[in-house]
């Protein structure tokens, strides 16, 4: 989660954490909105808004719901193959059930994957980002050895360039984890900005990934600088899609086409269609 400016602001991460597997938010007493003594710390409201955004994304989007469902799918095989100390007893030679593989596939599609970040890596401030065009892979989901769905998944090769000119190459498959952090940080940042925090300190000590990666990625995908409102909207609607990475690519491509061709109304139509399909999906499972 994001760091906070020591004197002027309180940001999510040091003081708050959302646990998607348990559906609860933990915020330390320093982030209280009604502290026992004195006034709330600057940025306390932004902290709560950040974590509540994760809560909403996990409970009210397709990516969040399916991430949770895929975890439920793994409960039975875990119990079946674990001893009383929760140690898995299946040997490495044992065959893995197709349904278990599919559960992990769905989880990875929904939550996303980022490859190439060294273990324990401490992100310095990135001076710039370089992104390649997204590449497509089709993931097959099976049940009882039969293919029940095919999902388009997009990955973006990315390079972070730092102030000392060294760089780090990673691959981002956008999903719930990356997109929700990007959207939550945009909301948090806007609240702090509107509260009077200086622009010079809004991103101070904030890790470049994932918080400061979402904005340049969206800018790249739409072909021009984006607004905070656009990034929040694009990210949220991407999470309503059956594939968050595809949802983000599709939404950004609609804006890009509008800009290139000078058309109007295409993005509004896309959002209406996306919302219609999500409501239809949600009504079908409730």
Language-model features: locations:
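Post-HEXXH active-site segment of zinc metalloproteases
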Residues: 38, 42, 58-99
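Short pre-active-site segment immediately N-terminal to the catalytic Zn-binding motif
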Residues: 27-49, 170-175
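Long, well-structured alpha-helical subdomains associated
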Residues: 95-183, 188-286
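Conserved catalytic core of nucleotide polymerization and phosphodiester-bond processing enzymes
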Residues: 23-26, 56-57, 62
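Active-site recognition of the HExxH zinc-binding catalytic motif
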Residues: 46-60, 181-185
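Catalytic zinc-binding patch centered on the HExxH motif and its immediate surroundings
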Residues: 1-39, 69-84
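Intrinsically disordered, low-complexity segments enriched in charged and polar residues
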Residues: 1, 11, 43, 50-53, ...
């Amino acid at each position: 989660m994001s760091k906070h400016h020591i004197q002027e602001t309180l940001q999510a991460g040091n003081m708050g954490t959302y646990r998607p597997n348990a559906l609860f938010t933990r915020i330390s007493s320093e982030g209280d909105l009604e502290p026992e003594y004195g006034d709330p710390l600057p940025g306390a409201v932004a902290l709560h808004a950040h974590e509540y955004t994760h809560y909403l994304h996990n409970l009210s989007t397709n990516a969040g719901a399916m991430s949770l469902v895929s975890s439920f799918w793994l409960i039975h095989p875990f119990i079946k193959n674990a001893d009383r100390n929760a140690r898995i007893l299946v040997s490495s030679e044992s065959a893995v059930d197709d349904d278990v593989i599919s559960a992990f596939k769905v989880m990875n599609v929904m939550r996303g994957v980022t490859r190439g970040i060294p273990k324990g890596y401490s992100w310095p401030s990135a001076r710039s980002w370089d992104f390649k065009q997204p590449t497509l892979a089709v993931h097959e989901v099976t049940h009882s050895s039969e293919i029940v769905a095919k999902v388009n998944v997009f990955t973006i090769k990315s390079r972070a360039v730092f102030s000392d000119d060294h760089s780090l190459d990673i691959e981002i498959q956008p999903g719930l984890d990356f997109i929700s952090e990007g959207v939550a940080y945009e909301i948090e940042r806007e609240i702090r900005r509107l509260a009077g925090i200086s622009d010079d300190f809004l991103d101070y000590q904030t890790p470049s990934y994932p918080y400061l990666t979402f904005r340049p990625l969206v800018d790249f995908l739409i072909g021009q600088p984006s607004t905070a409102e656009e990034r929040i909207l694009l990210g949220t609607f991407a999470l309503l899609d059956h594939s968050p990475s595809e949802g983000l690519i599709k939404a950004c491509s609609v804006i890009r086409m509008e800009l290139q061709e000078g058309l109007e109304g295409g993005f509004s139509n896309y959002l209406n269609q996306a919302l219609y399909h999500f409501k239809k999906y949600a009504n079908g499972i409730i």
